[in-house]
Regions:
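Short, glycine-/small-residue-rich phosphate/pyrophosphate-handling segment
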Residues: 99, 111-169
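Short, catalytically relevant binding-site loops at active-site mouths
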Residues: 92-94, 136-138, 175
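Cofactor-binding loop segments of dinucleotide-utilizing enzymes, especially the Rossmann-like FAD-
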Residues: 8, 41, 132-134, 171
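Short aromatic-enriched loop/helix-cap "lid" or pocket-rim segments at secondary-structure transitions
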Residues: 48-52, 142-144, 178-183
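Short, flexible segments with low predicted structural confidence
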Residues: 75, 130, 179-181
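Beta-strand-loop-alpha "switch" segments that mediate conformational coupling across diverse proteins
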Residues: 167-177
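Residue-level signal for alpha-helical context at structural boundaries
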Residues: 34, 118-122, 147, 176, ...
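N-terminal beta1-alpha1-beta2 submodule of the flavodoxin-like/Rossmannoid cofactor-binding fold
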Residues: 1-116, 187-223
Length: 223
């Protein structure tokens, strides 16, 4: 069983990465038959869809697959054949990181077929997914913003392509710097952030860990 944990943050040791690590641990703790592959997207040189449309060519050798040659060409094929995928991204302007958006374009666009008759989705398999969204703002800010609607568009298309409603984990009010005194950031209530980091973030990590275990259990139940 192969599960991917894909980090769309440029940092490998802050909130998004920590949550993904907990997801990976939850999955791996289910037994030696579970292989979790952690991918840091910022280690790869790639762009979003280049609109070459090789994935749409009639009788094309790359029909249904991204053919653009760069660092993720093979990775896209490997991820599409995974048993489960967790996508982790910090939130910028209520949306995914640019690297994560580019990766998802390349991963999912080839699997949407522009034809009248079914099937209009040609992904090689259905895959359960998890999204982990780490954001700097307090939860109250998201209640009056389009944040979840914007992120929900990605969840919608992921379900459309991979056939499962994604499980979504939101981590709010995350700790952004190692030393807040070095940065212009007095808009935030630092004591509140410290308290949230000490009391809520461990709960978020546990939720991510549980999501990893639940994904493996779901996959085993399907066999």
């Amino acid at each position: 069983m192969v599960i991917y944990a894909i980090n769309g943050s440029p940092r490998k040791n802050f909130s998004t990465a920590q949550l993904l690590q907990q997801f990976a641990k939850g999955a791996a703790d289910c037994g030696p038959d579970v292989e979790v592959r952690v991918i840091n997207l910022y280690d790869y040189n790639f762009s979003g869809c280049r609109e070459c449309f090789a994935c749409k060519l009639k009788d094309g050798k790359s029909y249904g697959w991204c053919a653009w040659p760069d660092d993720i060409t093979q990775l896209l094929k490997d991820v599409a054949m995974a048993d489960g995928i967790a996508f982790g991204s910090p939130v910028f302007f209520y949306d995914l990181s640019a690297q994560m958006k580019a990766f998802l374009e390349r991963l999912m666009f080839p699997f949407t077929a522009f034809k009248k008759d079914a099937p209009r989705v040609i992904a090689p398999k259905q895959i359960p997914t998890v999204f982990i969204h780490a954001m700097n703002v307090p939860v109250e800010r998201t209640l009056t913003s389009p944040c979840k609607d914007i992120l929900g568009n990605t969840h919608f298309w992921t379900k459309h392509v991979f056939g499962h409603q994604p499980q979504v984990i939101y981590a709010y009010n995350t700790w952004q710097y190692t030393d807040y005194d070095k940065y212009v950031a007095d808009i935030w209530d630092l004591e509140d952030k410290k308290n949230w980091k000490e009391t809520q973030f461990p709960i978020d990590c546990q939720q991510a860990y549980d999501a990893g275990k639940q994904m493996v259990e779901q996959l085993r139940a399907q066999k």
